[in-house]
Amino acid sequence: MKFAGSRALCLSSVVLSFAAAGTCHGQATNILTYKGADRDQRVLDGARKEGQVVIYTGLVVNVALRPMTEAFMAKYPFVKMSYWRGESEAIASKITAEIRANNVVGDVIEGTGVGELALAADIVQPFYSPMVEALPKAMVDPSGLTAPTRVSYFALAYNTKLVPADKVPQTYEDLLDPMWKGKISWRIESASGTPLFLTNLRLAWGEERAMDYFKKLAGQKVVNFGSGSARTLVDRVMAGEYPLAVNVFAHFPVISAAQGAPVNSKLLDPVPSTGATISIPKNARHPHAALLLIDFMLSPDGQGVFSKAGLFPAHPGVRPSDVVASVDPTIAKVPVNFIPSDVINKYEPRSDEIYNELFR
């Protein structure tokens, strides 16, 4: 993207770089997968000695990342938590450069789309957290290379001043109405944008029906938005630049709507869903502190931080906030198509081809 350009290049360069870096200095990994009765104490003692942990994440700083940092350090004041925020491709590129330089700074990587790149490039190592046992089995990576931190649901965003309530698209087919020609936008440089939109319908409908739909959708002259995140695209919808945007994080519009912005979300059946994941890069400097942070983020305390930030916690015992309940498909009773990272990796090359054939 530049759908099959920049993102595909990013993925291939990550894979090649990590293959070349496979001979990087070794690291004792037994603490990462240790399950003995004294595991938690070992992690705590080791983290105390290490004294710091660095996370690379896609979390928005003021919304969730800073509150998470403050909550973690309040519980474990002897571990200084530092962070760097970026999109998934940027996180992968940053870790790539660090491994190539044999100077890995990031101890933990987290975000939507990061897991796909991590698994495809073989850049992370197995770990065990007892907190994973409480998470939905369908979201848990059996290899132990990733663990889900939060659930992402994707929806249609619309400007409430430009789209009358009785004209809001209720289905994917409604997007084919001539009134929306040239007024639909989507993100082309993010795995959770255009490729996930295409993959979702290919999986749900089958290739034949999906391709027939995509050909019709191409006639709608969908606007390729390629210069920002999902949050940025929602801001453009709020500003009236685009009446509609497909496959944005469902919580962004409703949070803005609660603050008085002219925007809202509409869940379309099936709702594409992915899990933001957390992992430990190979050769991480602070493995004990990395485990301590992961334990915290997956615990009810850490999951509560996600909930307060308007995100959807992966832990089934932690409810999302009332602000975003309206776009929780499990509450709204809208069918969900949860797509694991390995399935996204399998389907994305063809989805890239479809984009280039029909929409570029």
List the model feature ranges, each with a label:
Residues 68, 209, 213, 285-297, ...:
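Short amphipathic alpha-helical coupling segments at ligand-binding clamshell hinges
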